Amino acid sequence: MGRLVGHTDKTPVSLGLLGAAAFMVIADVRVIDPLLHIIAKEFNVGVGSAAVIVSAYTIPYGLFQLVYGPLGDRIGKLKVITAALTAFAVGTALCAFVSNIALLTLLRFLTGVFAAGIIPVTLAYIGDNFPYTERQAAIGKYLSALVLGQILGGSLGGIFGEYISWRDIFLLFGIVSLAIAGLLWRGTRNFRDGNRSTERFSLATFKPYYQLLTQPTARTVIIAVFIEGFCLMGAFAYCGAFLRDRYGLPYVTIGFMLSSFGLGGLIYSRSVKWLVQRLGEIGLMGVGGWLMCICFLAIALLHNWLLFIPFCALMGLAFYMMHSTLQTQATELAPEARGTAVSLFAFNLFIGQGIGAAVFGRVVDNFGYIPCFIIAGIVLALLATWLFTKGKAEAEVRG
């Protein structure tokens, strides 16, 4: 992918290496999707109850955005990314040795705490090095690594779950993440980030969060990404168990099927410029949300597992159409403190996912998968309509 800017003394590590770190974080999240049914069976709990390991990861991931954003602005974003990835690697590897669901939940919680300091801080770092007109394309390239994590995370989870052991995939991810952290440390140990804030880290550090929320645009972005995380990511966590329970498919097949979501994201990353030119930011959010609704309804109501693959891929494309647009807007909410702005954005995304996974877990255990997917789809359509109409109205006011 090349370096962030043309001068190697300013950016000591490549965007590709930062993308590798992001790949591991996303793969670590998505690997759970095909394994949830296996883990529930091994520890003798329901699928909805086993999903506590999803919430245990995503809720602290969201909460600690509020710490890592300002911390990155003050001590240097690359240092935060390197330290967080190192701790993430250790926590992930230890998941391979748990003896009960409670210990796995605790380790997933700690891993989520450390994972929080990687992707959003990197996005803020990209924001510091690209002008706004080039930023969405740059973020689109960075998203390629995240999409690859989406694709291979689910696939590897299915392969290990079916043929090896779900424990070994965590050990593998931990070792690889530690190696990437070592490469980051080698490139950044003598680097001083010129974009650091000079203010001391204290309770006053969190004041910018309140200031951001006083902005109407910021409130719109934050509310939208919370709903997106709650509905899309919260409900999607149950797709793997749904495929197993409804169709009795092998775990390896389920893993590859879930990976089609990432394929849709890859299509987005390769066509982002064309999509932006054709639809604009407002159109991307509207069309993306409506397509996500259609996909959830199709998965719930069409009784053919082969149809899951194209609709899952379309859902991935639709998700990135909306999410990447919101993400790009988030990088411009506070140009003087992008780490803080992006962290507030990620906080709401993953808090939404954690709460959504818990709520939809209760829905699945008590009413089944179909109501879960229908509710998620309808709410996403309403979100898309709100963003589209609000965006159109604001564009008309601007003239």
Task: Report residues per predicted region.
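Juxtamembrane intracellular "pre-TM" segments in multi-pass secondary transporters
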Residues: 2-7, 189-221
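Helix-breaking motifs and short loop linkers at transmembrane-helix boundaries and internal kinks
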Residues: 44, 76, 97-103, 114, ...
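Conserved MFS/SLC helix-loop-helix module at the cytosolic interface between two early adjacent transmembrane helices
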Residues: 63-99
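Helix-to-loop junctions at the C-terminal end of transmembrane segments
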Residues: 65-76, 267-280, 364-365
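Helix-loop-helix hairpin linking two adjacent transmembrane segments in secondary transporters
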Residues: 103, 132, 141-188
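Cytoplasmic helix-loop-helix junction between adjacent transmembrane helices
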Residues: 107-148
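C-terminal transmembrane helical hairpin of 12-TM major facilitator-type secondary transporters
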Residues: 282-326
